[in-house]
From Swiss-Prot:
Organism: Shewanella amazonensis (strain ATCC BAA-1098 / SB2B)
Compartments where located: Cytoplasm
Name of the molecule in the record: Endoribonuclease YbeY
Family note: Belongs to the endoribonuclease YbeY family.
Keywords: Cytoplasm, Endonuclease, Hydrolase, Metal-binding, Nuclease, Ribosome biogenesis, rRNA processing, Zinc
Cofactor note: Binds 1 zinc ion.
InterPro entries xrefs: MetalPrtase_cat_dom_sf_prd, YbeY, YbeY_CS
Nucleotide-binding is among the record's keywords: no
Enzyme Commission number(s) of this protein: 3.1.-.-
Amino acid sequence: MALELALDLQFAVNPGNLPTEAEFETWVRVALGDTLDEAELTIRIVDATESQQLNRDYRGKDKPTNVLSFPFEAPPGMELPLLGDLVICASVVENEALEQHKALEAHWAHMVVHGCLHLLGYDHIDDAEAEEMEALETTLLTGLGYPDPYKEQ
């Protein structure tokens, strides 16, 4: 059965140089795979100021970051398709792509996949979790035709 996806894209920056809605949807669908029958999530594209504020308020890090994930936790006994929210900072993604010599589209795909995996419960706090998450990201992204995001460019 195909994933029934409700994707809410919010642009708090000029969407001129950003991926298309179709690209975002493709990346989300690939990241979620066949783990769910239906899912709802929001992806908000923000500037460095908003990213820094959220990163400071929720993670205690006073700097903008590439992607923040906010998983939705349903009350016990309630089954809801809400996955949560991703907040992606456009300028950080662009700067990282330049610094790391990556194609901008490939880095956007990586950030969306990475964030979605966090919403599914993956993490990279310890080495074993990081290896598992990075291996899955690499498999998903190379399956889309992008290079391994963890390989030196």
